[in-house]
Each structure stands twice: as structure tokens, then as C-alpha cells.
Amino acid sequence: MASLRKEIATRARAEDVWDAMRDVGALHTRLVPGFVIDTRLEPGARMVTFGNGTMLRELIVTVDDRQRRIVWSAVGGLLSHHNGSAQVVEGPNSETKIVWIADFLPDQASGAIERMMEEGLAAMKTTLDRLAENV
């Protein structure tokens, strides 16, 4: 099973970052606009439409307010297994770190998944840095 870990830092406050991340039905407006263009909530899940046209159903495993961590599992697409998590970590000097981990099969999808994660994190950083400027 392949595993990727990516992280970014932002000037946005950790509580504001977590508020946007935990809003599981608003990826396309509050966290990664452009990377995700639509999010529709279903019982225990969300249907996510990415900017490249890919649609996936993501089962929401947990939204942990104490740890500021969300876990989901993607269903559909080219992967036979996908488990993702994202965590908001308060850092030094008013900086907030976001850690995104993806575990998936088949291993051969690593390149494509890594590119998607990098694109998603770039959109997230832009959105969150803009949020920091408006506080």
C-alpha cells in the first residue's frame, strides 16, 4: 500500500483553518475552491467533484474537534482503496500547519495522487492565506 504525507504552512489562525476544514460540505467554497468545484452532502458521506471533472464519494470516517483532524475514505475512481486524513496543527510564530496523509492501492497511482495532493494543497494555501489577510 502506498502512503503519501504532504504539509503546508499558512498564516491563518488554527481555529479558522479548522473551522473551514471541518465544514465537510463546503470544500469548494471554504477550503480548496477551484481544486474542488462542488461538494454535496449525503448521510455519512460527501460527493466531491474536482476541477478536472473527477467525481468521488468520500465516506466521512471522523471529524475530531479535539485533535483538529478529519478522516475520510474515497469510494470509486481508479483506486481499489483510499484512506485520507488531514490535521490542523498550531505552530510557532502564529503559523498553522496542515498535514494531509493518503494511503491507497494500487501503489502505481502514486504519481497521480501526489500531483492531486500538491494541487489541492496549493489551492488550500492560497485560500487560507487570503483568510489570514482578512482577519
Regions found by a protein language model. Give the residues of each.
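Hydrophobic ligand-binding cavity/cleft-lining segments
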Residues: M1-E42
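Residues at beta-strand starts and edge strands
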Residues: A2-L4, T54, R68, H82, ...
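Generic structural detector for well-ordered beta-strands
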Residues: E7-R11, T49, L59, Q87
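Short beta-strand-to-loop capping motifs
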Residues: T10-A12, F50, A74, F104
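A short, structured loop/turn motif at beta-sheet edges
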Residues: R11-E15, T62-R66, V88-K97
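Glycine-rich portal/gate segments that line the openings of hydrophobic small-molecule binding cavities
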Residues: G25-G77, N83, E119, E133-N134
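Beta-strand/loop substructures that line and gate deep hydrophobic ligand-binding cavities in soluble
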Residues: V75-T127, N134-V135
